[in-house]
Regions:
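Catalytic Walker B motif of ABC-type/P-loop ATPase nucleotide-binding domains
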Residues: 96-100
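Conserved catalytic motifs of ABC-family nucleotide-binding domains
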Residues: 92
Length: 189
């Protein structure tokens, strides 16, 4: 397997990546760095006008085009996560891996982020969403893999895997489950 070819088809968003960017770097530079799979822009990187234009377009597509020239460190956590999503999307990867993308976000920012994910999924993009919170699973998620102690505990269609029994066993606690309009919510069981 050619790792570089595989990497070009994969966009990644994680809180670890968010912490690696200097506060002074401009938002547009964070997004452009996605073309180089780097943290920041370095002297050996040769930026094209097309790359900068594409980066601005992706920021606009996800509703934060007005933040392009602001320092990354001046953005809210939710805005920073959306910038990282734009960075992941700038090369138009076939697949996205989102590792706890809404951790630390307030309710409004979480809902906004999930709405963006729903839009991406409806356009046919494959998304692997890593989360500890069932309420973050958009209705468009079809397959769920539950992990316990590093092992696959359950794997299959969301409707058959997400149930109170599986979740209670998974978390070693009584868990109830509420479903509404394709969304799930875990509650004390």
């Amino acid at each position: 397997v050619n790792v570089w070819a595989f990497r070009s088809r994969l966009g990644i968003v994680s809180s670890d990546l968010q912490q690696n960017y200097a506060a002074y770097i401009r938002t547009i530079e964070v997004v452009v760095s996605g073309f180089f799979a780097s943290v920041g822009i370095w002297n050996h990187h040769q930026l094209s006008d097309d790359q900068v234009e594409r980066s601005r377009a992706v920021l606009s597509e996800i509703g934060i085009g007005d933040l392009a020239d602001r320092p990354f460190g001046q953005l809210s956590t939710g805005q920073q996560r959306r910038v990282l999503l734009a960075r992941a999307l700038v090369t138009e990867p076939a697949n996205l891996v989102l590792d706890e993308p809404t951790s630390g976000l307030d309710l409004t920012a979480t809902f906004r982020y999930l709405d963006t994910l729903r839009h991406l999924m409806s356009s046919g993009r494959t998304i692997v969403l890593v989360t500890h919170h069932i309420h973050e699973l958009p209705p468009e998620i079809e397959r769920v893999v539950l992990l316990k102690e590093g092992e696959v505990f359950a794997d299959g269609p969301k409707a058959s895997i997400l149930n109170a029994q599986n979740l209670s066993t998974l978390f070693d606690a009584p868990v109830g489950l509420i479903q509404s309009n394709g969304w799930y919510q875990a509650v004390p069981g």
